[in-house]
Regions:
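Catalytic domains that recognize anionic headgroups
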Residues: 1-163
């Protein structure tokens, strides 16, 4: 599963559904369709559980499909840093955590990178670790810092720019 090269190996043949004049892009798009199907089934399974609270999903990296660059640091472009990131919550969780949900709603356009998941995950799970938790790295926190200059990639050598 996933959307890594070679794309054709990351979905069943039955998911070869997109056909255009760009087979490379078609294969990638087919991986996205299959991935969405798997995530939908995962969510349905989890949401049906009485103890379901939250589901957090993010990708490890993006791709530069339109440029046919794959995910290669030698040919880095900012699009490689744009990742899908979403959360789903039970009704119980939503009603029990209104401030957290309000903060998330207010930050739909904020920058976030997957190296910040630790602090966000702690908050989502209600785990308090004062010596480790950094609220500026938690997108659900009142103190989240989305100052553009602090978001870098390639070992801090390249800025992540807004879309």
């Amino acid at each position: 599963m996933g959307s890594h090269m070679p794309y054709a190996y990351h979905h069943p043949k039955s998911y070869e559904k997109i056909h255009s004049d760009d087979p490379y892009r078609d294969q990638y798009d087919d991986t996205i369709l299959f991935h969405d199907y798997v995530m939908e089934k995962l969510y349905e399974t989890l949401a049906a559980r009485p103890d379901f609270q939250t589901l957090l999903y993010f990708s490890d990296h993006g791709e530069a499909i339109d440029l046919h660059l794959d995910h290669n640091p030698a040919t880095y472009v900012p699009a490689m840093t744009y990742i899908p990131f979403y959360m789903a919550f039970s009704d119980t969780y939503l009603s029990s955590h209104p401030k957290l949900i309000e903060n998330l709603a207010a930050r739909q356009k904020s920058r976030w990178t997957n190296d910040l998941v630790f602090d966000t995950q702690l908050a989502l799970m209600g785990i308090r670790l004062p010596d480790l938790y950094e609220p500026e790295n938690d997108i659900t926190s009142d103190h989240y810092d989305d100052t553009p200059d602090r978001f870098k990639t390639l070992f801090g050598t390249r800025a992540i720019t807004a879309k």
